[in-house]
Structure formats: structure tokens, C-alpha cells
Amino acid sequence: MLKRAIAPVRNVFQSIARAGTAGYPPDTVRRLKILNVIAALIALTNSIYALQLAMGDYETMKPVVWINLVLSAIAASVPLTHRISETAGGLILVTAEFVALLGFTAYFGRSGGAPMQYLVAAAAPFVIFGLDRLRLVIA
């Protein structure tokens, strides 16, 4: 009974993971599935942040709300970019994250904690691009 109840949720997650991966070799599909799940989590969490901030003090937090919404839209579009190339989605996501961090740092200042996220963001390219593209990761 539990399997039947969980099946629709599992199917949704599998669909998200598989989106845009058709036609790629198995190793690439595995990496793109991971990227799709990461992008979906980014889209979901940034949407939640935007909603929370908008419901609190929208006028004060307006720039942060919009940065989060734009980042959510970009992250949600990552599976579509796999049709361009296997690295396009990762490049777009990493670039958007770094630009968003710059925006958060500009808004909150250096003491706001956003600069600490650059340490976390430095590890993301290893997951997104894999060790096969070490030059791209280092760049």
C-alpha cells in the first residue's frame, strides 16, 4: 500500500531527473540527472525564499525577492538547455548562482554572510561538470 501511495511522487522525481537526457551516453545521463535534481531543488528553495521574503517586508526585500525568482526560473530551465549541449545547463546554473551571490553581497554587504557561499559554490562545478572537464571546473 505504501508503494502505491509513493509511486506518483517517485514518478514525478524520476521525470524531473530524466528531463532532457535522451540521446546522451550513460555516464553523461547520470551527470545530467544529478544536475536536474540540483536545479529542481534550487528552483524550489529559491521560490520558497522569495515567497517568505515577499510576505514579510516586500518593499525592503524587493531586490532579494526578484533575484530569487530569476534564479528559480533559470534553475527550472536547466533541463531545456541539455538540448544545446551537455555542459550548457551547468554553465548557465553556475553563472547564475555566482551573479546572484554578487547581488546578495551588494544588497546585504559583506557581513551578511553571502560571501561565505562562494566557498560552497566553489565545489559545485566538480559535481556539475565532473572531473573529466577539469579545465572547465578550474575556470
Where do the PLM segments sit?
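Short functional linear motifs
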Residues: 28-29, 134
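Compositionally biased, intrinsically disordered low-complexity regions
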Residues: 22, 111-115, 132
